[in-house]
Swiss-Prot record:
It comes from Paramecium octaurelia. Keywords: Autophagy, Cytoplasmic vesicle, Endosome, GTP-binding, Hydrolase, Lipid degradation, Lipid droplet, Lipid metabolism, Lipoprotein, Lysosome, Membrane, Nucleotide-binding, Phosphoprotein, Prenylation. It is found in: Cytoplasmic vesicle, Phagosome membrane; Late endosome membrane; Lysosome membrane; Cytoplasmic vesicle, Autophagosome membrane. GTP binds at residues 15-22, 34-40, 63-67, 125-128, 157-158. One of its GO terms (biological process) is lipid catabolic process. Induction: Expression increases two-fold during phagocytosis (at protein level). The modification Phosphothreonine is found at T34, T40, T64. A motif (Effector region) lies at residues 37-45. Belongs to the small GTPase superfamily. Rab family. A lipid is attached at C205, C206 (S-geranylgeranyl cysteine). It is a peripheral membrane protein. Its EC number is 3.6.5.2. The modification Phosphotyrosine is found at Y78, Y88. This is Ras-related protein Rab-7a.
Length: 206
């Protein structure tokens, strides 16, 4: 059997409404920021090509609604994900406290094959408002450590601080799952027509 590496990785972004999930995605994919976003209804996604280990792959980044009334739709969007990004707002302690419930919900509804080793990345957004900080970086680092040494970045969707580095690590985390999920194809067999010699007619007596 021959194997082929995946060319598309599905990334899910989760977090409370208002933490900046859409802004993060738009800053990374389009290098743009606006204050005019409306709350995401259901889910939406953007795609971006990125180099990982000297090969080009596509990240399909899903931005999901943070409102409770849409959480029942999660399973349909979470399944098949290669990495889950948990986002909170460093000026909003409640959004940080919600990380546990978002992580648990993803594991329950997304049903990854290996939940203990599934890659999560935590982003503390709105670093541009550091003077209004309510969640200390050390507290977030401790949370990540206690949940399996989850990768962690403080970022700003507004001024792009740490966005590129964070998503590079997100892409690598997604690709790390390939060893367990390689796509296998049957070995190719070439079929050729063999020339058939006409069989001699057998004579018979009437």
């Amino acid at each position: 059997m021959a194997s082929q590496k995946k060319q598309l990785f599905k990334i899910i972004i989760l977090g409370d409404s208002g933490v900046g999930k859409t802004s993060l995605m738009n800053q990374y994919v389009n290098a743009r920021f606006t204050q005019q976003y409306r709350a995401t209804v259901g889910a939406d996604f953007m795609a971006k090509e990125v180099m990982i280990d000297d090969r080009m792959v596509t990240l399909q980044i899903w931005d999901t609604a943070g409102q409770e009334r849409f959480q029942s739709l999660g399973g349909a969007f979470y399944r098949g994900a290669d990495c889950c990004v948990l986002v909170y707002d460093i000026t909003n302690p409640k959004s940080f406290d919600s990380l546990d419930s978002w992580r648990d919900e993803f594991l329950m509804q997304g049903q990854p094959k290996d939940p203990e080793h599934f890659p999560f990345v935590v982003l503390g957004n709105k670093l541009d408002k550091a003077t209004e900080r309510k969640v200390q970086e050390s507290k977030a680092q401790q949370w990540c450590k206690s949940h399996g040494n989850i990768q962690f970045f403080e970022v700003s969707a507004k001024d792009a601080t740490n966005i590129e580095q964070a998503f590079q690590d997100i892409a690598k985390a997604a690709a790390s799952q390939e060893k367990d999920e390689e796509i296998f194809f049957p070995t190719t067999v070439t079929l050729t027509k063999q020339s058939q010699k006409p069989q001699a007619k057998q004579g018979g007596c009437c």
